[in-house]
Each structure stands twice: as C-alpha cells, then as structure tokens.
Amino acid sequence: MNPRLDYLREKTSLLTTSPGVYQMKDEGGNIIYIGKAKNLRNRVSSYFARTPNHTPKVASMVANVYDYDFIVTHSEYEALVLECSMIKQHSPKYNILLKDDKG
C-alpha cells in the first residue's frame, strides 16, 4: 500500500467527467505538469491506475505527484486554449521533458 497513491486515487473518484485542465503538483506544491482532458476523471485516474503502463518519463512524473488541482471548462477547445496558456505561464518541468519525446 502506498498512502500517497491511495489518496490520489480516492481524490480522482470525486472528479467530474467534464472537460478541463489539470495541474499535477509535487511535494512542495509546485506545478510539475499541466494537461487537458475531455473527461477529467478518466484522464487523471489513468495516471494512478493500479497496473499502469507508462513510459519512463511519465512514470517519473507520477512518482513525484503528491496532489493535483483542476479547472473545469465548457469544451475541449476551451481546455486546449487554457492548457496552452498555463504551460506558457508556469513552464512545468514535465511538460518540457515530455515534449522532447514528441519530436
């Protein structure tokens, strides 16, 4: 059992199925990753699945997540625009690292 992951999994069960943007935070509360989702509950819970199938960089990010916040949007397009704006504003560590893999 991992109390940190148990907490994150439990918190995802309370998420909405609406589109939105999520902000993964490290132990100090710093934003380390920003992502968008058409279904916040499904997307965020996929990071904390009991049998994850993550790339090494995503696994590294998940290992450093201690909490997350989210913002509900009216549409996927609004989530995309907000995600882009927030990434430019915060320059989260893992958005930059994961971008390198997308060539």
Language-model-detected regions and their locations in the chain:
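Acidic, glycine-enriched active-site microenvironments
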Residues: M1-G103
